């Protein structure tokens, strides 16, 4: 594996399939005294989910935080919106709704 591929998987978050808890390496795990910046692969073998006590095998990789959602091969489709992060998509959607609302309210000013 290349150095870039190894670096990308280090900061990946993992989600518990049982309860939905997300292990974020940037934060670590205070309940089990896991230091921040500890990758999921370096957690002890006996580490369990702090919420439901599921084993490490019950976790799935959901990728790093702040990246575009969806499959990487699908990010090139559409009008470029697929490359936006979920927060950027929220701003785009609700910003457009607010502008539309203001436009229709401004029609009351016409005589």
From Swiss-Prot:
Gene3D superfamilies: 2.20.28.10. One of its GO terms (molecular function) is electron transfer activity. Residues 11-62 form the Rubredoxin-like domain. CDD domains: rubredoxin. Keywords: Electron transport, Iron, Metal-binding, Transport. One of its GO terms (biological process) is alkane catabolic process. PANTHER family: RUBREDOXIN, RUBREDOXIN-1-RELATED. This is Rubredoxin. It comes from Nostoc sp. (strain PCC 7120 / SAG 25.82 / UTEX 2576).
